[in-house]
Amino acid sequence: MFEKLAVLKVKLGDRHSDIVLRDIQLWRKPLDGDNDNGLDRSISNVKEINYLKGEFLQYIDINKIPLWLRSSEHFSNLLICFTTSTTTNAFFESKLKYINRGIVIEVNSAAAAAAANNYQHRYLIFYKNGHNVEFIPIDLSLKELFDNKIASLNADTENVTEGKEKKKSSSIDKILMQSQKKVFVQTNKVMESLQISEKRQKFNETLSKLILSGLRLRGIPNTQSGFQKIYKMTFDTTEFAHREELVKLSHNTIHEIPFEDIQETVETLLKLFTKS
């Protein structure tokens, strides 16, 4: 046997202030038939109808609602919604056509407290089950218990740590500091390696351009036999001649090898290798 629990009127918020959902009838039927033994007696003894006001909050995926947030009433009863309002019916048909979508309604706490038998649920979630619109009452008592436990644990933690020297870091702080220091060191190493690589690349590019320019001035085209041999000999010998500077460059102890020094070495070697 169905039992009428309440009639709800809902505002849709500022964006749709001109629309009010009326005559949202909340009904209950025990899942085991007409036997009310499993019901919360404070609810099953309702003799008067609760007239409540509520406001739309948001949409939600009903599959993501924790079981411990659902009122025990939800598990032992069929909780279903009826209406004679075409506006209300059209709203539910339109907004609940998506799979697993739920509509969260906040019941006005003052209105609930003033209603017959002090209707206890502040939040209701409406969803579509087949052709029916059903609802889930949300029970926040367990959440409040969790919140109180957390607050108590935080207070205990503060009492335990109070009086300790401020300069001492917690183990988590130490871990974070060590991690940050490690990241900082690694970043510096990477940046230093990049700088060294860029300096060496600049040296190679400068050396290559000087050799090619010197060979071109001497009228030796890259198609001529022996061009590659002279180029490689000059390149390798210049590197050897500046080996000490290159070592310092790799250790980042000097900024760069002066262009004039490289040019002078290349010119000397090209005169030697080309006899010009």
Swiss-Prot record:
Pfam families: Sld7_C, Sld7_N. GO terms for cellular component: chromosome, centromeric region; cytoplasm; DNA replication preinitiation complex; spindle pole. Coiled coil: none annotated. The keyword Disulfide bond does not apply. Keywords: Cell cycle, Cytoplasm, Cytoskeleton, DNA replication, Nucleus. It comes from the Eukaryota. InterPro entries: Sld7_C, Sld7_N. It is found in: Nucleus; Cytoplasm, Cytoskeleton, Spindle pole. One of its GO terms (biological process) is regulation of DNA-templated DNA replication initiation. Required for the proper initiation of DNA replication. Required for mitochondrial morphology. Belongs to the SLD7 family. This is Mitochondrial morphogenesis protein SLD7.
